Curated annotation (Swiss-Prot):
Origin species: Sphingopyxis alaskensis (strain DSM 13593 / LMG 18877 / RB2256) (Sphingomonas alaskensis)
Domain of life: Bacteria
Name this polypeptide is given: Crossover junction endodeoxyribonuclease RuvC
Gene3D superfamilies documented for this protein: Ribonuclease H-like superfamily/Ribonuclease H
Biological function: The RuvA-RuvB-RuvC complex processes Holliday junction (HJ) DNA during genetic recombination and DNA repair. Endonuclease that resolves HJ intermediates. Cleaves cruciform DNA by making single-stranded nicks across the HJ at symmetrical positions within the homologous arms, yielding a 5'-phosphate and a 3'-hydroxyl group; requires a central core of homology in the junction. The consensus cleavage sequence is 5'-(A/T)TT(C/G)-3'. Cleavage occurs on the 3'-side of the TT dinucleotide at the point of strand exchange.
UniProt signal peptide: none
Annotated EC: 3.1.21.10
NCBIfam families: ruvC
Subunit-level organization: Homodimer which binds Holliday junction (HJ) DNA. The HJ becomes 2-fold symmetrical on binding to RuvC with unstacked arms; it has a different conformation from HJ DNA in complex with RuvA. In the full resolvosome a probable DNA-RuvA(4)-RuvB(12)-RuvC(2) complex forms which resolves the HJ.
Keywords, ordered alphabetically: Cytoplasm, DNA damage, DNA recombination, DNA repair, DNA-binding, Endonuclease, Hydrolase, Magnesium, Metal-binding, Nuclease
Active site: D7, E67, D139
Length: 156
């Protein structure tokens, strides 16, 4: 089964694809979808949608795992993140994928063993779980972590 992990953001959405065969997990691909901060919001959302649709079409995942949104002190940032998340959820649904959402603390716990793990700890464990994988950046690393979290939870 191919799982698409997603870490939504308006500026840089991370994506990661893993293959699960029994208890074995292997890396397929990962990347980041960046939008132009100077572009109008609708144009940025269209770019995110188009790029995500291409990833889904190219790799034909069976399901998607998306990191849940967190609310911060800046309402504008939270709204922008919510817009991007909506596009990601819609794109996955349009692509025929079942979508499961995971809280960031649960993802960290699934990868490192503690929900309070730092990003560096998550990235280090990804190197152990997916040896030899070149990760496109921190957002792609988070997306791979979400995909692995889903792989672990669907076995239960």
């Amino acid at each position: 089964m191919i799982i698409l992990g997603l870490d939504p953001s308006l500026s840089c959405t991370g994506w990661g694809l893993i293959r699960v065969e029994g208890s074995r997990i292997s890396h397929i691909a990962n990347g980041q979808i960046k939008t132009d901060a100077k572009a109008a919001l609708p144009d940025r959302l269209v770019h995110l949608d188009t790029a995500l649709a291409a990833v889904i079409a190219d790799h034909a995942p069976k399901c998607a795992a998306v990191e849940e949104v967190f609310v911060n002190d800046n309402p504008q940032s939270t709204l922008k993140l919510a817009h991007a998340r909506g596009v990601v959820l819609l794109g996955c649904a349009r692509g025929g994928l079942t979508v499961t959402q995971y809280a960031p603390r649960l993802v960290k716990k699934a990868i490192v063993g503690t929900g309070g793990a730092a990003k560096g700890q998550v990235q280090a464990m990804l190197g152990v779980l997916l040896p030899g994988t070149k990760v496109a950046g921190p957002d792609a690393a988070d997306a791979l972590a979400v995909a692995i979290c889903h792989a672990n939870h669907r076995r239960r």
